[in-house]
């Protein structure tokens, strides 16, 4: 079974990949820093979830 993510996490991640897709990599730690740069997310949990979803989308582009 896969992970079910909340809609707002998917929306933020989709917009980030759409606008800054060439900047993100398959490295989760780098993506955490980039998510902090490009968004106003203050919470660590939400930031990590968005960064994880972005990492997954970059790693498996056919899932976008």
Curated annotation (Swiss-Prot):
Keyword flag Hydrolase: no
Any GO BP annotation: translation
Superkingdom: Archaea
TM regions (residue ranges): none
Keyword match Iron: no
Keywords, comma-separated and alphabetical: Ribonucleoprotein, Ribosomal protein
Sample GO molecular function, one term: structural constituent of ribosome
Gene Ontology CC: one annotated term: ribosome
Entries under PANTHER family matching the protein: 40S RIBOSOMAL PROTEIN S17
Family assignment from sequence similarity: Belongs to the eukaryotic ribosomal protein eS17 family.
NCBIfam families reported for this sequence: PRK01151.1
Protein name: Small ribosomal subunit protein eS17
Source species: Methanococcoides burtonii (strain DSM 6242 / NBRC 107633 / OCM 468 / ACE-M)
Gene expressing this chain: rps17e
